[in-house]
Amino acid sequence: MRFRSLIVALVAFFSLAAKPHAKTTAGDVFPDIQHERVDYWVSEFSTDHDYHKKIADGLARKPKYQKMIQRKLRERGMPQNLIWLAMEESAFDSIACSRQKAIGIWQLTPDTARLWGLKVTKKIDERESVEKETDAALRLLTHLHERFGCWYLAAAAYNSGEHRIARIMKKTLGREKGRDRDYYRIWDKLPGETRDYVPAIVALKRIGKDPAKYGF
C-alpha cells in the first residue's frame, strides 16, 4: 500500500512539474457554507483565551507571507482564501513543528515534502524555506483538487490523507469526486480532527474578513 501511494504521488508530482502553473477551473472558490461547526469555531476562536491568542498572533504574522502566497495562488488559478489553510495549520508560524515532525507554515511531514519535490535530509530541509514549502503545498493541493473535484474534499485529504478520503467517498457516496457540500455528507465518517478541519478554516476565513467584529 505504501509503495502504491508513493507511485501515485510521484506520477502526480511529475505531471504537475511538467505544467508548473496548471490552473484549476476558473471561478473556483473555497466557499463559506453555513454549518453549526463553523459557528462553533468562530465562537471558540473569539472567546477561548488560548485560541484567541494563537489567532491574534497568526493574524499579526500573516502580512509577512500574504503577498507571496496570494501571488502563487493567483498564478495557479487557486482560490485566494486557501491562505487560511496555512493559518489553520500553523498560524503562519514558520518554525512550527508537530509531533509527526511536520514543520513550517504548511506543516508538511518529511515524506510528504519529499514526494512533492522538496529536499529533506540531515543537512538540508527545504521546508524551512517558506516559499519552497508553499510551492510544494500548492502542488499537493492542486493534485488533491484534481482528484476529488472540490476544495473542501481536497482540504480534508490534505489533513487526513487522500487514500482515506477516497475510501470514505467510495464507500459512502460510490465515487471519489464530489462537491463541497459532500464534505458534510461524509462528515460522520471522518476522523475527529478532520471533521473540524474544514469548519475551522471557514471560521478563520470569516474572522479574517472583519477581525475587529470578532474581537481581534
What is each of the regions a protein language model found here?
Residues 78-95, 154-159, 202:
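Short, functionally critical alpha-helical segments immediately adjacent to catalytic or ligand/cofactor-binding
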Residues 2-6, 10-77:
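An acidic, Gly/Ser/Thr/Pro-rich helix-cap/linker signature
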Residues 21-48, 97, 111, 121, ...:
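Catalytic and substrate-binding regions of cell-wall glycan-acting enzymes that process beta-1,4-linked
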Residues 67, 71, 83, 135-142, ...:
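Solvent-exposed, polar/charged alpha-helical surfaces in well-ordered, non-transmembrane soluble domains
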Residues 51-66, 75-78, 98-106, 126-137, ...:
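Solvent-exposed, acidic/flexible segments
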Residues 100-122, 130, 134-141, 175-177:
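Substrate-binding/active-site groove segments that recognize
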Residues 209-216:
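Helix-loop elements that line ligand-binding/catalytic pockets
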Residues 120, 144-155, 175:
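Inter-helical turn/loop segments and adjacent helix faces that build the functional surface
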